[in-house]
Amino acid sequence: MKNLLLQKFHQVLEHIAVNGSATLNELAEKLDIPLPTLSRLVSDMVEMQLLEKLDYYRIAPAPGLIRLGECSKKHSFLLRNAVPKLREFSEKKRMNSIFAGFDGQNIFELFSTCLPENHPVSVWESGLAPVIMTAAGISDGECLRQFRQNTPRCSEADVLIFERELEHIRNARQLFRTTSMRYWSCAIPFNYREMCCGICFYGSAPENCSREKFDLECSLLVSRIAAAVSEE
């Protein structure tokens, strides 16, 4: 139940971030969320300063949402172009995706998908955060400091693995993880205006798909998104 509510929470934030203001009735119809549930969610988001009420029926992005995810009109073009492609690719491959950005100090999530069979992970657990920060020119020492800060339960073994991955990222500019259970994670960076972004796909490896083919497909998708938004 908690995961379902969290999913609806993100659906509302995504819709308002991309489309701007909307009425509660419009949201309830488009997102297929019961109006009473939606009203409670929106009330919580207003208290958190993620949304603001324009009147009794209409809501809009609040400064908290704009700062949290850089989801103002400034970046709506990026989201409109990226999100449909990410959702389509994720559904086709039956894998989760994370789309995140870096404001020079903090990593923030812009969009994510969560399939029931793939347990959701954070931008740090997925390996996307160090990929983005490395592409932005952040030092290994600062990446390691933020890794410890954002994953307080990490062991020394986790730290050693992270350090080795940082070295790999410096050379490859992206990160591909794979396990014997065919669990894959592919994180790739790209730039949008002055902001460094990144996309990660992770979960059970697609059937009849090699690692090389999947890596290429992910790279081509990110390239198409980067090319589309560069024409803004």
Model-identified regions with their sequence ranges:
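N-terminal helix-turn-helix
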Residues: 1-72, 227, 231
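Short, structured helix-loop boundary elements
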Residues: 3-6, 62, 75, 79, ...
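Short amphipathic alpha-helical signal-transduction/dimerization elements
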Residues: 17, 137, 141-145, 219-231
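Conserved beta-strand cores of small sensory beta-sandwich domains that regulate signal transduction
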Residues: 52, 98-100, 174-177
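Short strand-connecting beta-turns/loops that link adjacent beta-strands
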Residues: 56, 104-105, 193
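Short loop/turn microsegments at loop-to-beta-strand junctions
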Residues: 56, 97, 128, 184-186
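Amphipathic alpha-helical effector-binding/dimerization core
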Residues: 63-150
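Extended hydrophobic
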Residues: 155-229
